[in-house]
């Protein structure tokens, strides 16, 4: 198995679903791995968990959206799956 390609595929999937509520199981299923093995491989190759990656990317995108100044904080929070602004 090409682990780098598998993790890149998972990252592409996560990037495409930043505004969706996705789970570790969803991502693992996409790359045909168990949740345990996916999280372990992702953590080894990226030095962060999939949840940390999603949280950082969502926060980064939310910040960029807010910097544009055209969206309300509550709208951006809900867009990126935050429960409250």
Give residue spans per PLM region.
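Terminal helix-turn-helix DNA-binding modules in bacterial transcription factors
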Residues: 8-25, 44-80
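Key DNA-contact positions within bacterial/archaeal DNA-binding proteins
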Residues: 36, 85
């Amino acid at each position: 198995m090409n682990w780098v390609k598998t993790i890149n595929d998972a990252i592409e999937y996560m990037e495409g679903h930043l505004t969706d509520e996705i789970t570790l199981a969803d991502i693992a299923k996409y790359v045909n791995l168990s949740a345990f093995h996916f999280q372990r491989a992702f953590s080894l190759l990226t030095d962060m968990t999939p949840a940390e990656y999603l949280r950082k990317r969502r926060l980064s995108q939310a910040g960029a959206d807010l910097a544009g100044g055209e969206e309300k904080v509550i709208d951006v929070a809900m867009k990126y799956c935050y429960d409250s602004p």
